[in-house]
Amino acid sequence: MLDPKLVRTQPQEVAARLATRGFQLDVARIEALEEQRKSVQTRTEQLQAERNARSKAIGQAKQRGEDIAPLLADVDRMGSELEEGKRQLDAIQGELDAMLLGIPNLPHESVPVGADEDANVEVRRWGTPKTFDFEVKDHVALGERHGWLDFETAAKLSGARFALMRGPIARLHRALAQFMINLHTAEHGYEEAYTPYLVQAPALQGTGQLPKFEEDLFKIGRDGEADLYLIPTAEVSLTNIVSGQILDAKQLPLKFVAHTPCFRSEAGASGRDTRGMIRQHQFDKVEMVQIVDPATSYEALEGLTANAERVLQLLELPYRVLALCTGDMGFGATKTYDLEVWVPSQDKYREISSCSNCGDFQARRMQARYRNPETGKPELVHTLNGSGLAVGRTLVAVLENYQQADGSIRVPEVLKPYMAGIEVIG
């Protein structure tokens, strides 16, 4: 959530920055609500002062033996007007809050300005895509060869956009997740967490999925119980660990990592990536989250991105890093880098990680704060998140980049300890 004071007092400036994201702020409505709020607030304060004066006058009139009935009537009338003023203020604030929940984050000044992915800026590349001397197969053909990747049975069980993995491919999938978790905890300083896969609505509101993106979520409800949602990413549960807290500055940065399944309806992805594991309703991801001092958050974003890159480097998978433009960033991000891995069968790079600094946007929604040692006052933390990595898409990249002419798959060197020394599958 944006700073309400900033939106109320500088709506034109905020609107101009949001316009670079393709978001149109209803400035006229905000200004009208602000005028109403000021008017009602002023009248309420005047009434409260008058009521206090009348109450004092009642005591003095009693001492003089005067008739206090008119004064009591005035106090009652003012009390009713004050209650009405409070109702009006609550209604105005409620509408402002609802508007604020639907407004995306402001882009950082360093973010490229553009309407869509065509305006994203390539920052760097690592590795060179391999040249194959045989016809490249996609991961579906490679996985279905021995029945180890089975979309037909998955569809029978659950419908479209699900995968059933068996045998060596299931083991390779598990090996990737274990490798990622071990790397981030042992070398990058993250604390491993095991989180619930079901969360309540306030957690999703805290990280920005609700109320705007409810159609992308899977909801579970029982009569008489609060609705629960399957997490679309462990970002939700990890970031909300600090919801409602005031942290000691010495605790920062907090760095969490978790391996979880993620669940997404893919409501806006009809017809896209219908073949294979690129876009699934259920997929595993290793998620990194950092809670940091605001002064260090953009430096932390570079480090977080490097942590995700290290996974690809150790797997020896060619990739590139993109700085997303204003029009392509996620709702809560103020700056984002995407990592795209080389997928030989598609002859292009595909997203495998998104690393974002959300500034104080999520922290304000969650009321996650730290005590500033210089002022002694609570201030909002900054939150960051990034995939380290999406396990299914990493599996796709490994299968395709490590394939051999006979359809077998070489096991990447760093994964061999997790595969009991197996060097080739298939």
Swiss-Prot record:
PROSITE patterns named among the record's database cross-references: AA_TRNA_LIGASE_II
Highest taxon above the source species: Bacteria
Pfam families: Seryl_tRNA_N, tRNA-synt_2b
CDD domains for the chain: SerRS_core (cd00770)
Positions that bind L-serine: T233, A234, E235, E287, S387
Disulfide bonds: none
Any GO CC annotation of this UniProt entry: cytoplasm
A molecular-function term among this protein's GO annotations: ATP binding
Gene Ontology biological process terms, A to Z: selenocysteine biosynthetic process; seryl-tRNA aminoacylation
EC main group: ligase
Annotated InterPro entries: aa-tRNA-synt_IIb (IPR002314), aa-tRNA-synth_II (IPR006195), aa-tRNA-synth_II/BPL/LPL (IPR045864), Ser-tRNA-ligase_type_1 (IPR002317), Ser-tRNA-synth_1_N (IPR015866), SerRS_1_N_sf (IPR042103), SerRS_core (IPR033729), tRNA-bd_arm (IPR010978)
SUPFAM superfamilies hit by this protein: Class II aaRS and biotin synthetases, tRNA-binding arm
Family classification: Belongs to the class-II aminoacyl-tRNA synthetase family. Type-1 seryl-tRNA synthetase subfamily.
Domain notes: Consists of two distinct domains, a catalytic core and a N-terminal extension that is involved in tRNA binding.
Function: Catalyzes the attachment of serine to tRNA(Ser). Is also able to aminoacylate tRNA(Sec) with serine, to form the misacylated tRNA L-seryl-tRNA(Sec), which will be further converted into selenocysteinyl-tRNA(Sec).
Protein name: Serine--tRNA ligase
Gene that produces this protein: serS
